[in-house]
């Protein structure tokens, strides 16, 4: 799985998530463009999950250890499965031009783990990064064509990184943290067959605190992780 994820719903898989900022065929649009919630005319709940199966084979590997010369090492591969759930709610306020929404999903994550037998351990090991985005949004329909939307995002992130599992000097990092972001969006409906949407999601710099183990000496530390903004 890559670091930035597109899998905030299941329905967009067949079109590679193209147009997710305006299609609004279910409640998951709250995770893409808050303004497009105005296109939903009744309360709606959407729940889904995506499994990402990563299978990669590496061959013809050349490795230069810190205290040795370049050498060829055995072939290896990756075979990881990552489960990504999501849940969304959209609720139009009857008799008003307002629509409210809430979402729990993930925008960022990766899960890579090499076998302990991999002969280039400082490049192998395990890299696991996970994030949970809990968002609350509102949309206002200005007229039949235009809608505006926005919301706040509470992002919880955790990660585990380990290297050199067979060495006397292993590295292991286990940390987590919370950041606060926001999102803004606009939707424009031309007619029943044409519409446009644009959204911007500000992703904060997340401060992760936890345990850093290096050279068999554990200590508590923190690291600032700048998350990329999203425009679609």
Question: Which residue ranges define each predicted feature?
Answer:
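Outer-membrane beta-barrel porins/channels
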Residues: 1-16, 20, 63-73, 81-232
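Transmembrane beta-strand segments of Gram-negative outer membrane beta-barrel proteins
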Residues: 4-19, 38-57
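Generic alpha-helix structural propensity
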Residues: 10, 25, 29-32, 42, ...
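Periplasmic N-terminal accessory/gating domains of Gram-negative outer-membrane beta-barrel systems
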Residues: 17, 21, 26-37
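Short, conserved beta-strand segments within well-ordered enzyme catalytic domains
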Residues: 30-31, 44-50, 88-90, 99-103
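Glycine-rich nucleotide phosphate-binding loop and flanking beta-alpha elements
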Residues: 37-38, 53, 108, 144
